[in-house]
Amino acid sequence: MSFIKEFREFAMRGNVIDMAVGVIIGGAFGKIVSSLVADVIMPILSFFTSSVDFKDLHIVLKEATDKTPAMTLKYGMFIQNIFDFIIIAFAIFLMIKALNKLKKEEPKVEKVITPSNEEKLLTEIRDLLKK
């Protein structure tokens, strides 16, 4: 089997295509959540914290010189990324919970297995021998 055929079979499997769609949707969802945090949640927090912009919070480890920029520890961006993570994790949790609920609600159809003529005959013989 040629390399191209193997790759085509791999790429056309349902799982790979589903995963690709998931990655694309996940990237778009990440942008939406980042915008929600940066443009909605953080300004509200800034309002309640005396107009502090969390993105600008940092600790200067080494002052800037003529040749090098300042070395800073940007803990404000870290706080913002934590909010991103919490919201994304919560949204994924809600989606998985909804999917699990849908899976549980699906009615389980049980197959009724009808015995063959031989099985019926053998059952009758067994029952007669028990008497």
Swiss-Prot record:
Keywords: Cell inner membrane, Cell membrane, Ion channel, Ion transport, Membrane, Transmembrane, Transmembrane helix, Transport. It is a multi-pass membrane protein. It is found in: Cell inner membrane. InterPro entries: Mechanosensitive_channel_CS (IPR019823), MS_channel (IPR001185), MSC/AndL (IPR037673), MscL_channel (IPR036019). It comes from the Bacteria. The keyword Cell membrane applies. Pfam families: MscL (PF01741). The chain crosses the membrane at residues 21-41, 76-96. Homopentamer. Belongs to the MscL family. Channel that opens in response to stretch forces in the membrane lipid bilayer. May participate in the regulation of osmotic pressure changes within the cell. This is Large-conductance mechanosensitive channel.
